[in-house]
Amino acid sequence: MVKSRRSKMLARNGMFYPIIVFAAFLAFIYLTFGDLWVSSPEETLKLSFVERNGTQFYADGQVFYVNGWNSYWFMEHAVDVGRRPRVRTMLQAAAKMGLTVCRTWAFNDGAYNALQISPGKFDERVFRALDLVIAEARRHGIRLILCLVNNLKAYGGKTQYVKWAWQEGIGLSSSNDSFFYDPNIRRYFKNYVKTVLTRKNTVTGLEYRDDPTIFAWELINEPRCMTDPTGDTLQVSFDLYPHCN
């Protein structure tokens, strides 16, 4: 009798455990990816590219004013399950306040949760987080200024590019300023810019360069070349990048 009852309990448990495992799996999927779902296309605001006419910006034939702010951390938070909802909360609040443009990072080079792990090698998980940021901004009618590298060491920056070239034995100098004049480092960065421009957003289906959500591109955050205070090195370096695509 006891043996029979025990057998029934084991049988029930044998069915119960897979159900628990499956439920836990569903919970994991929801917590990990639940916030990735962006509203359906009909709920997403339609945006057109902002154009310039003289000294004035226009969108859809109307004067467009930049009321903006800086939230550099969007991609960094979007890749983290626990902090991801903060991106949506910030965009919702900004839209209610009438803000129109947000500046944020589109880079993280060689650091924790790096977008670019090494030259030309990317973490798709982090790229999808950036996809989400752009899609969420579009949903709330917010345009973005995407910055492509840091002059400072945080998030890798130009220091990381110089380090990569130096480690491969092709760097001209260990100076951080060689980012601006070393042809191998410039090649690294141009390839990075091209990859970002031609990235097809996994949420919207648009390549970044074709997405009117992106108001502008910023080549580098707080650029400075300490070895050339005239600014000539910076100017020559930047003149090369419009041809990336």
Question: What kind of region is each of these model predictions?
Answer:
Residues 1-12:
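Short, low-complexity, Lys/Arg-enriched N-terminal segments of secretory-pathway carbohydrate enzymes
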Residues 18-32:
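Hydrophobic membrane-insertion alpha-helices, especially the h-region
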Residues 34-43:
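Low-complexity, Pro/Ser/Thr-rich intrinsically disordered segments
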Residues 42-245:
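Active-site mouth of glycoside hydrolases
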